[in-house]
Amino acid sequence: MAGWIKKVKAFQFKGILVILGCFLLIGAILFAERSGLSYREKAKKLTYLDADKVVMEETAIKTLKPTCLVLTDSSQANSTMAWIQFEQIFKDMKVGTDLVDVNHESIPDDLSDYETVVVLLSDLSPLKENVLKISDWVKEGGSAMFALTLQKDTYVSLIEQKLGIVSSGYTDAMVNSIYFDSEFLVGGGKAYKVTDGYESAWAVELSQRARVYAWADDTSGVPLIWEADYGNGKFVVDNFGFYEKAFRGFFAASYSLLTDVGVYPVINGSVFYLDDF
């Protein structure tokens, strides 16, 4: 041991060893810093739902209790077009429905089992005296929606005052742009242009008890969506006269006026996460 110490003392390049040691220490520190903190990931156990327990949309819809009566007329083209949109709306909103084609079927005698009635007819003549049955049901606390632009005739005249209408004619008004109330839709409070607009709205004037949520953005100001209380219930009327997919959201918002609570999913939405650029 003493001999080894003498050799170290006699070594002429002891300063170089110190410098070399410093470099080795710095290298070790840099290596540790570049390597990062090491960690051990815990094993994850993934649990998948059995395929036979997955509930498909069509199955879920069939299990819903029918709370909405939908009246259509297969002989009216716009009724068929509107039902295509409303069928999807009711699926998205998880609303159970009973569908009645008044061209072949009779509406139920008792409407008390339903919370809402949606009438997808512009010509109400196939309903005949059932128009009054629906209005009486609304007066007792029901909620009904006329989703198509109505054609003025004898049966419409029977209920137009109950719908909040004080004056009407046999003419239709042009709809080139729709202005929405700010409390009706997200993005409301301004007007939206309508591509290929035409005379699609029934020219009417409403009473003060009617609350208007959308109207034609022109000098006529024809009301396009409104609600009117009647007795213990209410009517909702869509008067814009467009039945394409692009207007599905307007129908859904109108339907939500019938009930205290409405749920509608955000569709066609995407989230993108960008990193390392």
Predicted segments with their positions:
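Ser/Thr/Pro/Gly-rich low-complexity linker/stalk segments immediately outside membranes or between
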Residues: 35-60
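Short hydrophobic beta-strand segments
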Residues: 60-78, 269-273
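A glycine-centered loop/beta-turn motif at secondary-structure junctions
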Residues: 64-68, 143, 200-269
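The substrate-binding groove and active-site-proximal loops of carbohydrate-active enzymes
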Residues: 118-125, 241-244, 276-277
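Structural recognition of the beta-strand scaffold that forms the well-ordered cores
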Residues: 69, 99, 116-119, 144-147, ...
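A glycine-rich, often tryptophan-bearing local segment used as a flexible ligand/cofactor-contacting loop or short
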Residues: 124-189
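Helical hinge/lid and interdomain linker segments adjacent to catalytic or ligand-binding clefts
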Residues: 76-153
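N-terminal Sec-pathway targeting helices
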Residues: 2-22, 31-36
